[in-house]
Amino acid sequence: MTLHTMFPTQVYVSHLRQAGWLRFNRELLRECQQVREYDVAGQKWCRDNYPGGYTSYGSLCHMQKMSSTFATLEQKINRHVKAYVRALEYDMSGRELTMTDCWINIMPQHVVHGLHIHPTSMISGTYYVQTPKGCSGLKFEDPRLDSFMATPPRKADCRPENKPWITVPAQAGNVA
């Protein structure tokens, strides 16, 4: 029997580690907290739609164009995006990837970020500035699940690539 793996979902996880990343994270955290404090429109939206948490998604979603700190984050992340694109073997001849959106999510304990997709993004990711000990990770689900309604459950010890979902641990300094 020959078994081929076709159409895999490849998840990129790496540490941003560059000299001074802890200092950079402290500056980024300070700026995130300042934005949350002054973003009245974002606060109003979050009161109704993101109880206990804060997101600048609906109010300030181009942070990389508004802040030199976030512009620096974009530069650091671009290195990882390029590595991911190479690993996926995309032909980028004559094409350029640009960060279109960059926003802040602050999720204290018991705040959840529900399942959602980014249908207009080629690559979507998260950078963790700060994560509390024991926090939940980033859950990825098989995008074909709606086609598997009659499929029996997976064995508890199945290989990660056969699971219907996986959770990547959230860790400060990681790009996922």
Predicted regions and their residues:
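Catalytic core of non-heme Fe(II) oxygenases with the double-stranded beta-helix
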Residues: 98-176
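Active-site region of the double-stranded beta-helix
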Residues: 62, 68-98, 108-122, 129-133
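Residue-identity detector for glycine
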Residues: 20, 42, 52-53, 58, ...
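Aromatic-enriched hydrophobic runs in primary sequence
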Residues: 12-18, 84, 95-96, 112, ...
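Non-heme Fe(II)/2-oxoglutarate
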Residues: 1-91
